[in-house]
Amino acid sequence: MGFPRIISKNNKIYTKLGAFCLSGDGQQFWIVCHTCQEELQTQDKFWKHIQDEHNFMHGPKQEQGRTAAQAYMEAAEAAAMTPLPLYRKVSENDQQRDDVVSTEDEDMQKEPKDYTEMRAHDDQQQTAAVAIDIKLEPSSLSQQSAVQAQQQQQQQQQQQQQQQQQQQQQEQLQQQQQQQQTQQIEITTPLMYQIPQVHPPVSAYAALVQAPAINTLNMSVAAAAAAVASNQVPSTMANLLPQELQYKQELQYKQEVQQHKESTNNSTTASASSAMSSDDGERFYICDFENCGLKFKYHSRLELHRSVHSKVRRFACEICGASFKQSCNLSTHRKKKHALKGTTKATLVPSQSF
């Protein structure tokens, strides 16, 4: 028959009536009674001891009607209300360790208490000092706040004045720039429109250098007088026109001259030299290059065919300068390479007659 026990640390089994203690090597054991602190060597002896000496599970003769559970609960309540110190066999080393740990715990508990007391004392001193300052110098504090407010107002006023000055300066600069731009436009616009509109039968360079008539309607009085007095309109024009504009004007002049020649001569020379009539009365054009002799129904087809012999590409791209034999090839090139749509004026290279 056993008894209730609870396993815990330090090789001990605690019950509500006794403690089961082991030796350090775990070979010897003893049981200590909680009620009378008597040491017993076996569990049977301890069980008999608590039954005989302390009436556990039996009770006195006049209380035979009580159950064992009631007796156990009464004994447990009595032990809980008046707990007795446990008997322990502790070595000297364990005792020293316990003393050191207990002293360290006490020091750790004292330190926060001392720190809190010091903080409370410092807070009290600070509050007292602030109260003294408020009592002694209330006027000085109000004066300082008033001075600070005045300084802030002055700084704000200065900043506003600086911003206004900067805005005025910017407006003046913008007005000056606009005036300068208008003056430059008045001086340069009449000179830019003095390009000759009629091409004389001379070279392109002579046409550019020839002095045009000075238009003084759109010029100011001072600018017109300066232009008439200096008589340097051709040189200023040459300086104003860039090289690209001169090159384009030369090409346009040559193209117009060539087109005029072709329009006047194609109807006579082409028909006279290469136009033939068949037996059926149908008119056709024959290529007269060496031994070619190909026949074409239209003169435009003959001109395209002649570019094969002359290796001249009449249609040139105005963006990249690539040249083509036919206008359709130029249009496809412009769509694919430059993503341009629609028809524009293509740069025509004059055809060579042979």
From Swiss-Prot:
Q: How does it assemble?
A: Homooctamer.
What segment(s) does the record annotate as region Disordered?
Answer: 84-124, 256-276
Task: Answer yes or no on keyword Protein transport.
Answer: no
Q: Describe tissue expression.
A: Fat body.
Localization, per the record, is: Nucleus
Renumbered to this chain, the Basic and acidic residues biased-composition regions fall at 89-100, 109-124
Q: Name one GO biological process term.
A: regulation of transcription by RNA polymerase II
Annotated protein name in UniProt: AT-rich binding protein
Cited InterPro entries:
C2H2-ZF_Transcription_Reg, Znf_C2H2_sf, Znf_C2H2_type
Give the function comment from the record.
May be a transcription factor for genes having (A+T) stretches in their promoter and/or enhancer regions. Binds to AT rich DNA.
